[in-house]
């Protein structure tokens, strides 16, 4: 319906340009998420990433991202505070991760917005809705010029993905192949 012009989205708002926060507030007692070997995270946008903000699947994804040579950085998107997608339902979608892949050492050429889902949620109506929204977002990003997305996005690929607990690693391997 969107492509046949039977349905249109009307965007109303004041601020459309998401920027990563310059700092984050954490509880003084919060424990930091470290790599599996106990070392500090190296590719996270922030040095301190609170471990209690991750479920087990999200931790596994973060550790996986830490080991990727093509990764420029990854960011744990905080629910109800950071980047969100407003679809046709009342509540916004807050993806779990935003990360960038690169072909060079000093810039990135791909941006990924990723939502992870446990096995028990994979066939839910909410997950189906998120898949539909992410598919629309990916198609819209592909059809937009860098002038519409902003100069910083010139020649960048943007993909939105919902990854199931039992397939996230295989999908990320495909996405991050050189």
Where are these regions (language model features)?
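Intrinsically disordered, low-complexity, repeat-rich regions
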Residues: 1-93, 100-178
């Amino acid at each position: 319906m969107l492509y046949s012009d039977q349905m249109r989205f009307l965007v109303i708002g004041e601020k459309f340009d998401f920027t990563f926060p310059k700092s984050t507030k954490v509880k003084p007692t919060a424990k930091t998420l470290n790599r599996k070997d106990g070392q500090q995270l190296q590719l996270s946008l922030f040095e301190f990433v609170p471990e209690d903000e991750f479920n087990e699947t999200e931790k596994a994804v973060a550790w996986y991202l830490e080991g990727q040579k093509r990764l420029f950085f990854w960011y744990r998107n905080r629910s109800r505070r950071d980047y969100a997608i407003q679809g046709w339902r009342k509540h916004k979608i807050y993806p779990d991760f935003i990360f960038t892949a690169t072909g060079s050492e000093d810039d990135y050429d791909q941006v990924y917005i990723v939502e992870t889902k446990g096995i028990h949620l994979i066939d839910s109506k909410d997950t189906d809705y998120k898949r539909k929204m992410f598919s629309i977002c990916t198609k819209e990003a592909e059809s937009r010029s860098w002038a519409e997305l902003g100069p910083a996005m010139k020649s960048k690929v943007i993909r939105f993905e919902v990854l199931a607990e039992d397939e996230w690693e295989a999908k990320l391997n495909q996405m991050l192949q050189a």
